[in-house]
Amino acid sequence: MTWRDAAIDHAKLMAPNESCGLLIDVAGDTVYCACRNLADDTDHFIIHPGDWAKAEDEADIIAIVHSHPDQSPDPSAMDRQFCERSQLPWHIVNPADGSWGKCIPLIGRQWVWAISDCWTLVRDWYALHGLLLPDWD
């Protein structure tokens, strides 16, 4: 089972609440660690500190994963802000249709033409501040 399959299964189990988890690097393999969500409402997540510590003890944490059970997996403004704070990539899944979104911190990105290039950096910086710019055609 891939980490994406594990994250989707966890998201389906937790719906209608958001699921949350961590990706860790175990000897070069990416592994999904399901975490408990401490948020009081269905539209947010707070990773249980004990789950974070356990994952951190097992291996390096390389990303955060959570679900948007009833909406697009595109990162919200809050997702973008907390992605920056965490300095980790965020993967977002909609368990209903299996679609994925991603948010990458502005600092430390690997440059990839048309995926994570200069325009993407500028566009994502503006999105972090509430101004959505279109992708170039």
Regions found by a protein language model. Give the residues of each.
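N-terminal capping segments
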Residues: 95-137
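Residue-level signal for functionally critical sites in structured catalytic/ligand-binding pockets
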Residues: 16-21, 66, 117-121, 126
